[in-house]
């Protein structure tokens, strides 16, 4: 069992080192997009499935509540939390539109949509990103593997260089925390 633990920790460390080497500028770019939107009284929307939905909720909570320091509440919403909207849209329009329909109803020009997908191929996240672009929103992808089709829809694509979902998810929440910390420093 100790060998398994060591293997997991070493894989995490290797992925972290790649993120450190390759993604600092992309994280910086994403933070600037978020900070500018929030300073212009715009909101941040986030979406994802499964663990990525949990990350979306976590990041939104850090912005609406607080992260490390006292500051005003910042407008952020995870599109995965409204079960009535999710089930109504899923039933009437299909699961691939559960986020896009919410973006259609909630997004205003200048808002930010952060789409989280370990594969970069989640159809409902992709459709939400397309809708956000149509509405004049900035788009940020927290992605994995090669970034998939979602990468091409992003103003800032943060693609974790790994094909292992657990490693990608670990980096996504760390990157989310870094974004929250950078946002904190601006308010």
Swiss-Prot record:
Places the protein is found: Cytoplasm
SUPFAM superfamilies: SIS domain
Binding note for cofactor: Binds 1 zinc ion per subunit.
Positions bound to Zn(2+): 58, 62, 169, 177
Alphabetized PROSITE patterns for the sequence: SIS
Catalytic activity line of the entry: 2 D-sedoheptulose 7-phosphate = D-glycero-alpha-D-manno-heptose 7-phosphate + D-glycero-beta-D-manno-heptose 7-phosphate
Pfam families in alphabetical order: SIS_2
Record pathway: Carbohydrate biosynthesis; D-glycero-D-manno-heptose 7-phosphate biosynthesis; D-glycero-alpha-D-manno-heptose 7-phosphate and D-glycero-beta-D-manno-heptose 7-phosphate from sedoheptulose 7-phosphate: step 1/1
Residue numbers binding substrate: 49-51, 62, 91-92, 117-119, 122, 169
Domain SIS: 34-187
Domain of life: Bacteria
Any one GO CC term of the record: cytoplasm
Keywords: Carbohydrate metabolism, Cytoplasm, Isomerase, Metal-binding, Zinc
Gene3D superfamilies associated with the record: Glucose-6-phosphate isomerase like protein, domain 1
Top EC class for this record: isomerase
Its job: Catalyzes the isomerization of sedoheptulose 7-phosphate in D-glycero-D-manno-heptose 7-phosphate.
Miscellaneous remark of the record: The reaction produces a racemic mixture of D-glycero-alpha-D-manno-heptose 7-phosphate and D-glycero-beta-D-manno-heptose 7-phosphate.
Similarity remark: Belongs to the SIS family. GmhA subfamily.
Quaternary state and interactors: Homotetramer.
Protein name: Phosphoheptose isomerase
